[in-house]
Amino acid sequence: MYLYTSYGTYQFLNQIKLNHQERSLFQFSTNDSSIILEESEGKSILKHPSSYQVIDSTGEFNEHHFYSAIFVPTSEDHRQQLEKKLLHVDVPLSNFGGFKSYRLLKPTEGSTYKIYFGFANRTAYEDFKASDIFNENFSKDALSQYFGASGQHSSYFERYLYPIEDH
């Protein structure tokens, strides 16, 4: 499974979504633009998307949920260690109130992994983010040992994706 992402204006991305209703397309609002995501076993219908292989997955994407996309930089010599760390987090995320979905994404190009957490709303996500589970497994401090030299060129950061009707 692959996840493709592309940013643009609401109107432009919404037209793509309307023209391809047979595809698994999800549109969200960010602080400064809109984003469209496509989950697919095959090639994307998006023209120039960022492409990721889904290497771990729980739950289904839904446009009515709040998402946090965490960008985790790494280097070639730390990739396997980072993947091993994130693939072996043995925590039932569904135990957290409002949890909806999770995706661990490996880049098809470049060295920045992404982690998507889907929750019913931002408050539920912020509660999860304050937990020991998040701080020990997904926080910048927990993952910084895997950044390698690439940490000088790209940063660990979060981007919030809001349901269109809520933002």
Curated annotation (Swiss-Prot):
Question: Where is this chain's protein located in or outside the cell?
Answer: Membrane
Say where the protein is mainly found.
membrane
- Cite the entry's keywords alphabetically: Membrane, Phosphoprotein, Virulence
Phosphohistidine modifications at: 65, 78, 153
InterPro entries the record matches = ABM_dom, Dimeric_a/b-barrel, Heme-degrading_MO
Keyword DNA-binding included in the entry's annotation: no
**Pfam families recorded:** ABM
Domain called ABM: residue spans = 66-157
Choose one Gene Ontology CC annotation of this protein and give it: membrane
Briefly state the modifications made to the protein after translation. Answer: Each of the three conserved histidine residues contributes to TRAP phosphorylation. Phosphorylation is essential for TRAP activity.
Q: Misc remark for this entry?
A: Up-expressed in ATCC 35984 compared with ATCC 12228.
What family does this belong to? Belongs to the TRAP family.
Write out the function statement from the record: Contributes to virulence and biofilm formation.
Q: What is this protein called?
A: Signal transduction protein TRAP
